[in-house]
Amino acid sequence: MTKIAVLGNGSWGSVLGSMLADNGNDVTLYGNIESVNEEINKTHTNSHYMKDWKLNENAKATGDLEEALNGAELVLFVLPTKAVRIVAKNVRKVLDKTGAKPLLVTATKGIEPGTKKLISEILTEEVYPNDEDKIVAISGPSHAENVAQKDLTAIACASTDEENAKKVQKIFSNDYVRFYTNDDLVGVEVGGAVKNVIAIAAGILVGQGYGDDAKAALMTRGLAEITRLGVNYFGAKPMTFSGLSGIGDLIVTCTSVNSRNWRAGKQIGEGKSLDYVLKNMGQVVEGATTVKAVHELSEEKNIDMPICDAIYRVLYENTDVAEEIKQMMGRDPKPEIRL
């Protein structure tokens, strides 16, 4: 049994926490909405984020970070990208007092705007300076709604330290979620983050009335952009993007109604504004934040990312969706395979 602190008790945090409790671990969920914490502890439900579902009764919740971290051997970050750095700073303060050195695992999929840092880079900076080996990222085709029902899936767990990846693989795996180790930490993170931008584009196509051929073409060219960014900016391995955290996560996020990024894109394709969509979603749309960082990165390194750049313009420069699609299809001819 491993003592685990799950930081973030939204839909994915709650499901992962419950899954880890299913696996026989001692799990404490940390969140800042007291009513959610009380509901989890009293009724083992989280109706604010997950309707008609119960957590494992052994999973506890608290709004006290020190309580959540007390004795934790593994700390799982399942937070919005914008919250990771401030929470990581607070985690460092607690760990400095106790002297504990738990393994840090991130299930957050994003790139921090401004700094353009991956989540593992933020955790390394704020918690374990110069010790990236203690960070593991998990990413793959895994919607909370499906994992909650114990539907089958597979997820990559990546670290620069193979033994730490194997530890996470052993702790997290069960009979409905299979984990595979990977040594390309940044590649796994880039795939998980940037696919959210492509999912917004996929939703926009559906909102505009386009069919399966258009969606398949978009996903394929979107994967090319993700790979290009991962390899040329972050030094990722190209083959990583053919795996669970690349094409696997991209497929499910671009095709499932459970994908909040896809749903947001569909509404934008139907004519809704980004402000309207974000106010009415009730959940974080990570792709809308990540696209800012991706746009900055593509311009900084002159990386060809026409889909991501178009999504940035639609969301933040209010360009016309139909015109962006027209311009995309009228671009100069290019070879299909290039980095």
UniProtKB/Swiss-Prot annotation:
Highest rank taxon of the organism: Bacteria
The keyword Oxidoreductase appears for this protein: yes
Biological process per Gene Ontology, one example term: glycerol-3-phosphate catabolic process
Active site as annotated: K195
Catalysed reaction, written as an equation: sn-glycerol 3-phosphate + NAD(+) = dihydroxyacetone phosphate + NADH + H(+); sn-glycerol 3-phosphate + NADP(+) = dihydroxyacetone phosphate + NADPH + H(+)
InterPro entries per the UniProt record, alphabetical: 6-PGluconate_DH-like_C_sf, 6PGD_dom2, G3P_DH_NAD-dep, G3P_DH_NAD-dep_C, G3P_DH_NAD-dep_N, NAD(P)-bd_dom_sf
Single GO term (MF): glycerol-3-phosphate dehydrogenase [NAD(P)+] activity
GO annotation, cellular component aspect: cytosol
Family assignment from sequence similarity: Belongs to the NAD-dependent glycerol-3-phosphate dehydrogenase family.
Protein name, entry field: Glycerol-3-phosphate dehydrogenase [NAD(P)+]
Source organism per UniProt: Lactobacillus helveticus (strain DPC 4571)
